[in-house]
Amino acid sequence: MKVGIHPEYKAVSATCSCGNTFEFNSTLAKESIHLDVCDKCHPFYTGKQRIVDTGGRVDRFNKRFGALSSKK
């Protein structure tokens, strides 16, 4: 590798809004970053995920135009 052309690789601290803090190595210029969600508070990883099914495009079409096809 050429000397002097690569960014500095250093430890960076990440703090989540839930209070979880962890460190990782990165080329970021910042010493710390703030996260909105992490694996400790994200609904998918905590098992609190809800599936919201509002119906698809086909259901919406059938609701609007389904009566027209049954009149034949």
Curated annotation (Swiss-Prot):
Organism equals Vibrio atlanticus (strain LGP32) (Vibrio splendidus (strain Mel32))
Mention any Pfam family matching this sequence.
Ribosomal_L31
Note accompanying the cofactor annotation: Binds 1 zinc ion per subunit.
List positions binding Zn(2+): 16, 18, 38, 41
Full protein name: Large ribosomal subunit protein bL31
**Disulfide bond annotation, renumbered to this chain:** none
- One of the GO biological process terms: translation
Query: Family assignment?
Result: Belongs to the bacterial ribosomal protein bL31 family. Type A subfamily.
What cofactor is needed?
Zn(2+)
Q: Name one GO cellular component term.
A: ribonucleoprotein complex
> What's the gene?
rpmE
What is the top-level taxon of the source organism? Bacteria
* Taxonomy of the source species: Bacteria, Pseudomonadati, Pseudomonadota, Gammaproteobacteria, Vibrionales
Q: InterPro entries under this entry? A: Ribosomal_bL28/bL31-like_sf, Ribosomal_bL31, Ribosomal_bL31_A, Ribosomal_bL31_sf
Record's function text: Binds the 23S rRNA.
Describe the protein's quaternary organization and the partners it interacts with: Part of the 50S ribosomal subunit.
A single Gene Ontology MF term assigned here is: rRNA binding
Q: Which UniProt keywords apply?
A: Metal-binding, Ribonucleoprotein, Ribosomal protein, RNA-binding, rRNA-binding, Zinc
